[in-house]
Amino acid sequence: MEYFNVGKIVNTQGLQGEMRVLSVSDFTEERFQKGARLALFDDKDRFVQEVEIASHRKHKQFDIIKFKGMYHINAIEQFKGCSLKIAKEHQGKLAEGEFYYHQIIGLEVYEKDQLVGQIKEILQPGANDVWVVKRQSKRDLLLPYIPSVVLGVDIEKGRVDVEIMEGLDDED
């Protein structure tokens, strides 16, 4: 079965079985809603167990979750550092022009059919995502995911076409 990362348990929260999660999903309300089923993986990416979300709330930059049947700190202490993942078949369908992070990371980036590099990470600093492009012999390039920069994404071909606006590449 194929799984995709949606968050990491960074600590416990109080004594009632709540955990602090750093989410890496654009769909936190959906991923962590009551009744959602996720898989736990340890720090060596080994499957630990499947869990069901009992509750979810936001607190500062964290998502605070509780698993069904685990209502005390002693039951969840062991999960600190674990990754939360969703099975591929539980991912919902996206609208045209929307993508999951795992579909974008690893794609090759081209400007006018010239290879720029490969997307290695996606940042969420504010209004728009920023795609981090790893380049040969140059510093990483930060590309905002906006229509004037990202001209096209072809998941099947593993390709992103961009127009690097003046000022985005400080190594030119």
UniProtKB/Swiss-Prot annotation:
- The PRC barrel domain covers 95-168
UniProt-annotated location(s): Cytoplasm
- Please give one Gene Ontology molecular function term for this protein: ribosome binding
One GO BP: ribosomal small subunit biogenesis
Q: Which SUPFAM superfamilies has this protein been placed in?
A: PRC-barrel domain, Translation proteins
The signal peptide here is none
- Where it mainly occurs, coarsely classed, is cytoplasm
Alphabetized Pfam families for the sequence: PRC, RimM
User: Which residue windows are coiled coil?
Assistant: none
- What GO cellular component entries does it have? cytoplasm; ribosome
Per the record, the domain comment is:
The PRC barrel domain binds ribosomal protein uS19.
Q: How does it assemble?
A: Binds ribosomal protein uS19.
Query: Its function?
Result: An accessory protein needed during the final step in the assembly of 30S ribosomal subunit, possibly for assembly of the head region. Essential for efficient processing of 16S rRNA. May be needed both before and after RbfA during the maturation of 16S rRNA. It has affinity for free ribosomal 30S subunits but not for 70S ribosomes.
Q: Which family does it belong to?
A: Belongs to the RimM family.
Question: In its UniProt entry, what is this protein called?
Answer: Ribosome maturation factor RimM
| Species this protein is from | Streptococcus equi subsp. zooepidemicus (strain H70)
